[in-house]
Curated annotation (Swiss-Prot):
Record's keyword annotation contains Ribonucleoprotein: no
Species of the source: Pseudomonas syringae pv. syringae (strain B728a)
Protein keywords: ATP-binding, Chaperone, Metal-binding, Nucleotide-binding, Zinc
Domain ClpX-type ZB: 4-57
GO molecular-function terms, A-Z: ATP binding; ATP hydrolysis activity; ATP-dependent protein folding chaperone; protein dimerization activity; unfolded protein binding; zinc ion binding
Quaternary structure, from the entry: Component of the ClpX-ClpP complex. Forms a hexameric ring that, in the presence of ATP, binds to fourteen ClpP subunits assembled into a disk-like structure with a central cavity, resembling the structure of eukaryotic proteasomes.
Name of this protein: ATP-dependent Clp protease ATP-binding subunit ClpX
Entry binding sites for ATP: P122, T123, G124, S125, G126, K127, T128, L129
Family, per entry: Belongs to the ClpX chaperone family.
InterPro entries (alphabetical): AAA+_ATPase, ATP-dep_Clp_protease_ClpX, ATPase_AAA_core, Clp_ATPase_C, Clp_protease_ATP-bd_su_ClpX, ClpX_bact, P-loop_NTPase, Znf_CppX_C4
Length: 427
């Protein structure tokens, strides 16, 4: 058709050989051997090729699932310690995505079940970081939900379906991608039952939320408003099947170690009672390793909810040595991050060993784990980061223990000059 029109016009007016638009209807017309293509058709062809390449890459990445050892090795680059938790997570995630690859095969009588994960560990021990690193490694949609904001449907607060809505937002509302994603629900211990005895008052943010999460975690078809709109009866919903979404729940479970110790410690009174000193008490991390489902039920989780989280991983408390490693060794270690910030100003940043030890000790005193390290360094480096951009002759900043303790200012080394004496901070 286009060739005929071109022939009739005797070459005076040119047309795209693909869409038939004339040279006046498009911005650019590219000539080939007896054919023409417009800029719009070129863009369309590029989009088609790009989509096919992305689909092929997604399929190849799905088949190239890293082994548990490889997963654990990559986690080692970002998370210090917690070897047992890494091993449990690596095996669970590997089996989960192996199960997803298996579901496409027909004539298979064995149906593999889903194994969701429960992470138990003190605050700042690396629960959220482990989940984030896993999602980045596997290149799947990932979202973090806060269990403390969830309430039963009909009450003020977030419905459990909002979790799936957040997951959809992470993948531009691609339902197929979302159905293979990972959801991390933080502070799961905060929705424990407030009391062992049933009450006439509704526990809308405790046991009620656990009941609402049951079907979502096990596998159901959740109805989610498109593009984050509010629910109303005349609206069409996106249907998301949660059977293949991996749920990882994490919490500090403060006080759980006492429940475990009460179960594992022989009681007694009188002359035959076993006498124990305070020094014989176990560390929190050691006690948590002995956790059993009954302990979680006594803590306040309902038995059905515990049953939906068959894979259990406990994290240890971080000691001073581990905190120093966290400051220096991971790919995105805090000292490397601040060194990069100073490098952008053309300044070297050096942390002395005694300074790192002092930072770790202060974090232990605050009982915030690795999460408290950044706030300590921010406070220490605030004045220096304020002054450095205004000084062009500083070549190096040195931080030692006295700077962390607040008894002196950072040592500034200037270009082509002797370093100035330290000056005590202003009162």
């Amino acid at each position: 058709m286009t060739d005929t029109r071109n022939g009739e016009d005797n070459g005076k007016l040119l047309y795209c050989s693909f869409c038939g638009k004339s040279q006046h209807e498009v911005r650019k017309l590219i000539a080939g051997p007896s054919v023409f293509i417009c800029d719009e058709c070129v863009d369309l062809c590029n989009d088609i090729i790009r989509e096919e390449v992305q689909e092929a890459q997604a399929e190849s990445s799905a088949h190239k699932l890293p082994s548990p050892k490889e997963i654990s090795g990559i986690l080692d680059q970002y998370v210090i310690g917690q070897e047992r938790a890494k091993k449990v997570l690596a095996v669970a995630v590997y089996n989960h995505y192996k199960r997803l690859n298996q579901r496409d095969k027909k004539n298979d009588d064995v149906e593999l079940g889903k194994s969701n994960i429960l992470l138990i560990g003190p605050t700042g021990s690396g629960k959220t970081l482990l989940a984030e690193t896993l999602a980045r490694l596997l290149n799947v949609p990932f979202t973090i939900a806060d269990a403390t904001t969830l309430t039963e449907a009909g009450y003020v607060g977030e419905d459990v379906e909002n979790i799936i809505q957040k997951l959809l937002q992470k993948c531009d509302y691609d339902v197929e991608k979302a159905q293979m994603g990972i959801v991390y629900i933080d502070e799961i211990d905060k929705i424990s039952r407030k009391s062992d005895n049933p009450s006439i008052t509704r526990d809308v943010s405790g046991e009620g939320v656990q009941q609402a999460l049951l079907k979502l975690i096990e596998g159901t078809v959740a109805s989610v408003p498109p593009q984050g709109g509010r629910k109303h009866p005349q609206q069409e919903f996106l249907q998301v099947d949660t059977r293949n979404i991996l749920f990882i729940c994490g919490g500090a479970f403060s006080g759980l170690e006492k429940v475990i110790q009460n179960r594992s410690t022989r009681g007694g009174i009188g002359f035959n009672a076993e006498v124990r000193s305070k020094e014989e008490g176990k560390k929190v991390g050691e006690s948590l390793r002995e956790v059993e489902p009954d302990d979680l039920v006594k803590f306040g989780l309902i038995p059905e909810f515990v049953g939906r989280l068959p894979v259990l991983a406990t994290l240890d408390e971080l000691d001073e040595a581990a905190l120093i490693q966290i400051l220096t060794e991971p790919k995105n270690a805090l000292t490397k991050q601040y060194a990069k910030l100073f490098e952008m100003e053309g300044v070297d940043l050096e942390f002395r060993t005694d300074a790192l030890k002092s930072v770790a000790r202060r974090a232990l005193e605050r009982k915030t784990g690795a999460r408290g390290l950044r706030s300590i360094l921010e406070g220490v480096l605030l004045d220096t980061m304020y002054e450095i951009p205004s000084q062009s002759d500083v070549s190096k900043v040195v931080i030692d223990e006295s700077v962390i303790d607040g008894t002196s200012k950072p040592l500034l080394i200037y270009e082509n000059s002797e370093p100035p004496a330290k000056v005590a901070p202003d009162a």
